[in-house]
Amino acid sequence: MLDFVNLVGSEACMERIETVERFNEIIAQDEPVVAIFKTSWCPDCHFIDPFMPELETNYAGKVTFVEIDSEKLLDVAQQYHILGIPSFVAFKGGKETIRFVNKLRKTRPEIEQFVDRAIAVSAAV
């Protein structure tokens, strides 16, 4: 199965984190990082795939988006108590700043509102 993110142009190409070391390196940045915890089998995770590349492009220079497969990086998912997917967790300087987790399917406006809030919180810390 082809992955939608790999089919889009170079403007939006969310990095998939494959190692704990890379995850720690990315979240240590001084700019906000939004980590999206997903799995390959989660329908709600795939629901967001069509609009995430555009969202990533719209927020370029303000926030970095990364994707984490919660099953492949189980240690990271457990460290941050990721129980539901998709889960959005924002970081700055290696510390969690805010998260967006609930049992419901996430919509584009909700995700945009979360990212705006993550940027604002990041600016305040």
Q: Which ranges hold each PLM region?
A:
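Short active-site neighborhood of thiol/selenol oxidoreductases, capturing the structured segment around
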Residues: 28-40
